[in-house]
């Protein structure tokens, strides 16, 4: 009986992981634990066969975010294996972000069998409930143990996962009760592997193609209010689709712009290509300067709203139609509640629009006068920024947002951490992110998992530049404990403002200095060179943009993880930025 259970645990683990690989899993993160041993051992064997990449992480929280970074950068499903108990609870922050950013990730969590539940058994908790509020599906193998799960039950579970990911991507929790024995002898492992390779490895399985059918009636209801002969603006927020669909997304956006002639405001993480006609540079500053004089009555909004107070005010006060087009995201996405929402994506919307209006495929409108005016406004602001921001300036956060896209090679990816970096880049980067893949996890917009996410992205797309504040970075320092993270071609631009500088901008005028520091800034006196040395990560401190350029070139050349620290004076930052904004708005 003992031999039978250990062999069935191992065989079912092999079958499950093999099927998940067949629906797109290429990368797997395994965390330590005994209860998950059959899954981990099976993953190791499939890795030996060259079927899946495996990386380990001793911290489940980091593992979840690492897997999410891989999913975002690759466009493929990623997978995390954990043991039971509190290990599962540590997956929640990554599950929250995966839910809100619509990224496919599977959490395989080992559990105790039903007979050990609700009786005080060690390390036995209600883990099947921990992720239920944010996961697309919560599934389970046989509650009495994996060894009692039938082959067809495993296949059905994988088909459910595949259908869910195809229609509405996000996190999926598959809880797997496993009874002892958890390990397997060398002889039994050899015998089970022979059976698996002979019968199951090359077996063909049928997975249904799921086509998302659009709602023509809903499209007609929404689009009838559009008048393409009148002025409008296309607003492109953070991209929530798969990176694998970016090309078709941009082709549809290009066609939409051609048939309207409208200007385009693109978020730094919109995924929009830099050569799109009609792009308005410095559009947030243009909005701030011309908030009451932009004359149009229709907006096409793609994806969630950018993190911009000026844009939010503009949308709230906008008197006209707003259409919000979403990419495989069926929840409400409009916090100001003024738009008609269309769930079926830009490609579908553009195709139906062309069909409905019988637009000639070769039809291409000239840029409308308003577009030309807004583009010219953006270029004028660009000249002011060029005059005020030079390589001789003392480094500030807003200057980094403007200069770094020009210093980092145009084709190399960038990740922006949450909090102040994404806001500064929205305002000052001058569309400098649009020549490359640019990532920022705007689903829940937390600072959680910053380093682990970056390491995950760098496994797929590198050399990667992570731009992060000091608190966001130190919050996830366990990311360095992910297997071979220090060997990634990853450059970390560490903005050291000795605390959460975004709170300086929000609360400085209303709090005493000691209150501000204790309650919001929370500065940490960290010896950064020693910290980097402890993790065997290369480190440099730079004081000006000339040295920063040299350091960035050096970081790419050594092809390993590097920390480049720049020190920011928050007082100087606020003073200089306010003076610059006054000059721009008053020009």
Swiss-Prot record:
Keyword terms, alphabetized: Magnesium, Manganese, Metal-binding, Thiamine pyrophosphate, Transferase
Pathway: Quinol/quinone metabolism; 1,4-dihydroxy-2-naphthoate biosynthesis; 1,4-dihydroxy-2-naphthoate from chorismate: step 2/7; Cofactor biosynthesis; phylloquinone biosynthesis
EC number: 2.2.1.9
Catalytic activity: isochorismate + 2-oxoglutarate + H(+) = 5-enolpyruvoyl-6-hydroxy-2-succinyl-cyclohex-3-ene-1-carboxylate + CO2
A GO MF term: magnesium ion binding
Biological-process GO terms, alphabetical: menaquinone biosynthetic process; phylloquinone biosynthetic process
Pfam families per record: TPP_enzyme_C, TPP_enzyme_N
Top enzyme class: transferase
Cofactor: Mg(2+); Mn(2+); thiamine diphosphate
Cofactor binding comment, as recorded: Binds 1 thiamine pyrophosphate per subunit.
Residue ranges the record marks as coiled coil: none
Record family assignment: Belongs to the TPP enzyme family. MenD subfamily.
HAMAP family from the UniProt entry: MenD
NCBIfam families assigned to the protein according to its UniProt record, in alphabetical order: menD
Function as written in the Swiss-Prot or TrEMBL entry: Catalyzes the thiamine diphosphate-dependent decarboxylation of 2-oxoglutarate and the subsequent addition of the resulting succinic semialdehyde-thiamine pyrophosphate anion to isochorismate to yield 2-succinyl-5-enolpyruvyl-6-hydroxy-3-cyclohexene-1-carboxylate (SEPHCHC).
Quaternary structure annotation from Swiss-Prot or TrEMBL: Homodimer.
Protein name: 2-succinyl-5-enolpyruvyl-6-hydroxy-3-cyclohexene-1-carboxylate synthase
Protein encoded by which gene: menD
């Amino acid at each position: 009986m003992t031999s039978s259970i250990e062999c069935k645990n191992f065989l079912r683990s092999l079958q499950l992981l093999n099927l998940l690989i067949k629906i797109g899993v290429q990368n797997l993160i395994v965390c330590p634990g005994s209860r998950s041993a059959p899954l981990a051992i099976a993953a190791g064997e499939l890795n030996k066969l060259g079927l899946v990449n495996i990386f380990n992480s001793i911290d489940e929280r980091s593992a979840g975010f690492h897997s999410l970074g891989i999913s975002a950068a690759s466009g493929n499903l990623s997978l995390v294996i954990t043991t039971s108990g509190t290990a599962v609870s540590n997956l929640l922050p990554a599950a929250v972000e995966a839910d809100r950013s619509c990224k496919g990730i599977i959490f395989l969590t080992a559990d105790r069998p039903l007979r050990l539940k609700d009786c005080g058994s060690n390390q036995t908790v209600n883990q099947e409930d921990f992720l239920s509020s944010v996961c697309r599906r919560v599934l389970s193998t046989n509650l009495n143990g994996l060894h009692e799960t039938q082959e067809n039950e495993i296949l059905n579970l994988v088909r459910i996962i595949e259908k869910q990911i195809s229609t509405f991507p996000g996190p999926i929790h598959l809880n797997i009760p496993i009874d002892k024995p958890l390990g397997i002898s060398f002889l039994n492992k050899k015998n089970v592997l022979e059976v698996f390779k002979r019968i199951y490895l090359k077996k063909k399985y049928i997975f249904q193609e799921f086509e998302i059918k659009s709602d023509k009636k809903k499209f007609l209801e929404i689009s009838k209010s559009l008048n393409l002969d009148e002025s409008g603006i296309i607003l492109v927020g953070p991209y929530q689709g798969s990176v694998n669909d970016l090309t078709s997304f941009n082709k549809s956006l290009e066609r939409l712009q051609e048939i309207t002639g409208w200007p385009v405001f693109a978020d730094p993480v919109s995924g929009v290509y830099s050569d799109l006609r009609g792009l308005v540079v410095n559009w947030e500053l243009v909005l701030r300067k011309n908030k009451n004089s932009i004359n149009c009555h229709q907006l096409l909004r793609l994806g969630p709203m950018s993190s911009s107070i000026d844009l939010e005010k503009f949308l709230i006060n906008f008197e006209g139609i707003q259409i919000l087009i979403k990419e495989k995201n069926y929840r409400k996405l409009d916090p100001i509640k003024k738009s008609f929402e269309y769930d079926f994506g830009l490609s579908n919307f553009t195709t139906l629009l062309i069909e409905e209006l019988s637009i000639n495929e070769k039809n291409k409108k000239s840029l409308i006068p308003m577009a030309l005016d807004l583009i010219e406004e953006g270029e004028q602001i660009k000249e002011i920024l060029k005059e005020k921001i030079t390589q001789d300036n003392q480094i500030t956060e807003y200057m980094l947002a403007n200069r770094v896209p020009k210093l980092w090679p145009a084709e190399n990816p960038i990740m922006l951490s949450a909090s102040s970096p994404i806001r500064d880049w929205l305002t000052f980067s001058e569309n400098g992110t649009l020549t490359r893949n640019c990532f920022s996890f705007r689903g829940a917009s937390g600072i959680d998992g910053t380093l682990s996410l970056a390491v995950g992205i760098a496994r797929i797309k590198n050399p990667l530049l992570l731009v992060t504040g000091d608190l966001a970075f130190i919050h996830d320092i366990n990311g360095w404990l992910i297997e071979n993270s220090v060997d990634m071609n990853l450059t970390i631009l560490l903005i050291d403002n000795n605390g959460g500088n975004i709170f300086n901008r929000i609360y400085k005028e209303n709090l005493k200095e000691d209150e501000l520091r204790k309650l919001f800034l929370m500065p940490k006196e960290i010896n950064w060179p020693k910290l980097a040395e402890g993790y065997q990560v290369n480190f440099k401190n730079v004081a000006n943009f000339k040295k920063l350029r040299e350091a960035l070139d050096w970081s790419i050349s050594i092809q390993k993880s590097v920390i480049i620290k720049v020190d920011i004076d928050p007082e100087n930052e606020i003073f200089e930025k306010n003076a610059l904004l006054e000059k721009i708005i008053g020009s």
